[in-house]
């Protein structure tokens, strides 16, 4: 039996020799240099390292995004056969929130405390007009079930401060 790594069609993310620099004190400094990784459909990947090692920068880069004051200086990021470093901002934005998402370390900081979870879950899909609000809400509840959130039919009506950090992270993933 072949593993998923033997089947190229299962390759979801292929980061090849990616390098990123940040601008500080009038010069560019390397932040990430020559990183390679592959992620296959169905796999889970965790990045572990010291504070300031570049984990968040690499996570954002995997979406084709670099922070203000940073730049890609080499390599490629292939997602579903497309090199994100070569796509226009418009094309990348079409992927963000629909095919690609980023779960921040501090999930609470990513949520608006004044809005219910369900509205924040569907916000990106609604802004891209992917479906009606009602359909997207039903889809969100189904995702809550798949993420094994408690009371998936009601949890979306809660505000971020009313759920745990782990539940917020799973909500972000949904």
Region locations from a protein language model:
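ABC transporter nucleotide-binding domains
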Residues: 1-174
């Amino acid at each position: 039996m072949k593993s998923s790594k033997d089947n190229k069609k299962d390759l979801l993310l292929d980061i090849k020799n990616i390098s990123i620099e940040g601008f500080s004190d009038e010069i560019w400094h390397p932040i990430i240099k020559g990183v390679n990784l592959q992620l296959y459909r169905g796999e889970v990947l965790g990045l572990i390292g010291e504070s300031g090692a570049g984990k968040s920068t690499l996570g954002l880069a995997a979406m084709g995004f670099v922070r203000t004051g940073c730049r890609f200086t080499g390599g490629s990021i292939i997602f579903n056969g497309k090199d994100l470093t070569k796509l226009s901002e418009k094309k990348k934005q079409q992927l963000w929130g629909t095919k690609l998402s980023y779960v921040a370390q501090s999930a609470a900081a990513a949520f608006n405390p004044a809005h219910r979870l369900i509205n924040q879950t569907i916000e990106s899909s609604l802004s891209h007009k992917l479906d009606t609000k009602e359909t997207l809400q039903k889809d969100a509840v189904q995702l809550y079930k798949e993420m094994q959130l408690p009371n998936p039919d009601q949890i979306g009506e809660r505000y971020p401060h009313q759920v745990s950090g782990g539940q917020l992270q799973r909500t972000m993933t949904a």
